[in-house]
Amino acid sequence: MSRLKRIGLVVLVVLVLALALIGLLTVTRGTPVGAVVTLADSGPPPVTDSLFERTFELFTGTHVFAGNNVQQALNGDGVYPRLWTDLRAAQHTITVQMYYSLPGKVADTMATILKERARAKVRVLFLVDAFGSQHLSKDYLDGLRSAGVEVAKLRALRWYTIHNAADRSHVRVVVVDGHVGYTGGFGLADYWLGDGHHEEQWRESNVRFEGPAVMELQAAFSAAWAESTGELLTGHLFFPNSGFQSVGPTHAGVLYTSPTTGSTPAERFIALTLSGARKTLYITNSYFVPDDDFRRLLERAVKRGVDVRVLTVSNKTDVKTTWYAGRHHYEELLSAGVRVYEYQPTMLHSKTIVADGLWSSVGSMNFDNRSMAFNNESCLVVLDSAFGASMDSVFLDDLRYSKEIKLAEFKQRSIWAKMIESLSAMTSRLL
């Protein structure tokens, strides 16, 4: 064998080993949460027990603050007009972090407002995920910079970071003057416009809130900004003392979760919530692909007498592979007593959970392995019966526009559909 061929063979072997390592790092990690157990007592604390809140705080690192004012901001009609008003009123700081952005009316309106406030000497920071917002043009970002907006991209793909290419920042953050916060599943794209009941208008759940929980949302932004730029944002400009003051009756906090070895805060949150429900458990999620452990927790909840219902997307989904992978598990869940519904009018993109009409979450976190293990995610958790009742009401109203999946009928689907579902489920670790 010639020297050139030997060199080529060595290079080929190195490349194969490198790709194998990347694949291994991508699809494997430590042991996730499989059960929530206790010893010598009655079991995991219900959401109505004060120990539940303390346990959640200890296991996720999220503090649930008293003194917040939280409001749902449903669909584009519910979030954008209020968001534009709050941004235009900013006097000191605006921090925006978005995963998904596309050119259009929404992105243009955001740019116009951010430029105007930056020219008014408000410090404006705009952070986007390099993959999710790849369609924002250089001219768009340069236009922001020229007006004084500080712009950064998070996790741009480099050859030396390729093993982390699947780890995206799926977070949605808007904070105005350290006092008003927004999070949820929305982005900067025109298909979030509207009421969520028409084909081209996505169904979305978001929240607008004031109070100490906003400081946690700001801290999540600061962590991401530091990752991208090396600048850790602190001080009274971003974290004013007045931002920690009580402004309402609601207990709430921001769960910010990121990839790690072993179970993630996202998984611990889900496991505690599924185990803490005693009466009702209403889950709305666009990408619902529960793994073996979470399916067992859902089935155990049914055995405890919990009314477990899942609302997910229909064939109007934007990611068919994930939809098929989720449907692969319908028979098991339906047989165990979990009720499953598919939203009919349009793409459902909401990510919410309500347990016992008391413990709720609204945010960016999907019910799949990508959100649990790969992505940075944010969601507002709320411990409040009034807010929980409003979440229950929205969930039940959404069921009016949904089709319940019945086991007998579902079993009659074609062999072709079953095959696609099985093949899609094989990729669940990456979805």
What spans do the regions from the language model cover?
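Charged, low-complexity intrinsically disordered terminal segments
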Residues: 2-431
